[in-house]
Every structure is written in C-alpha cells, then in structure tokens.
Amino acid sequence: MKKFLIALVFVLGIQTVFAQDKVSDTEKKELLAKSPFNTLYPTSILKSSDKYFTAQMGLFSKGVINEKNAHLIALGTSAATKCDYCIPYHISEAKRLGATDEEIKTAVLIAADVMKMSTLFYGNEFDLEAFKAMLK
C-alpha cells in the first residue's frame, strides 16, 4: 500500500507539472490586456483560465436560460454568498438587459428565502429522507 501511495503521489505530481500553460511574455501581456480578471490567475494557468472564463461567460449570452434571467439567477446567488464584486455587476447587467427593480428585488428575495429555509432545515437537523418523501 505504501508503494502504491508513493507512486500515486509521483504520478499526480508529474501531471501537475504537465498541466501548466506555457505562456510567453507577449502572450501574457495580451491576456492581461484582454480582461482585468486574468490578473487573478497565476501565469502557470493563465491560458486555461482565460479559456474557461470565456466559456463560462457564454452561459449568460448563449445558454438555454435567457441572458437577463441568467443574471437574475447569478444576482440571487451573489446576494446569498454576499459577494461585493458580483452583486453590482449582475444588477448592472440585469438592468442593461431590461430587468425591472421588481424583478431584481424578487431575485434577491428568492435567494434570501432559500437561505432561510436551508438554515432552518439544517440547523434543526430536519430528516432529509422524510423531506424527500414529502415531495413525492
């Protein structure tokens, strides 16, 4: 077992080395100029992070949920997680896409209600299987 664990650590360590992005100084400058969010990632994964972020943002503009509603969902999540950066961004985007103040307030209230109920269930150790049975 000890030899297996040593081999596993070795293999995982090698994979981590090969998973690193090769980025020239020119590419790094271009990626950093492309998006201020690219400054959040280490150079070793800068290309991969940029590709992931670009694809992730496509969920808003090209996903099966329309863009306004996607931002309202993200706003609710941002409010629940108390993200000072995400909240103003998603409010701005939702408004740009035509969301009303009423829709924004509703999205935040839904998130608050989910958090409240989750806290009540979790804190009172409500039986999960009994809850699932109630939903049938």
Where are the predicted features?
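Beta-strand segments within the central parallel beta-sheet cores of soluble alpha/beta enzyme folds
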Residues: 72, 103-109
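Short Fe-S-cluster ligation motifs
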Residues: 107-126
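Acidic, glycine/proline-rich low-complexity segments that act as flexible tails and inter-domain linkers
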Residues: 4-6, 10, 18-69, 122-136
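Amphipathic alpha-helical segments within well-ordered protein domains
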Residues: 57, 74, 91-95
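Iron-sulfur (Fe-S) cluster-binding segments and ferredoxin-like electron-carrier domains
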Residues: 49, 88-104
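Short, thiol/selenol-centered motifs that function as redox-active sites or metal-ligating centers
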Residues: 73, 77-89
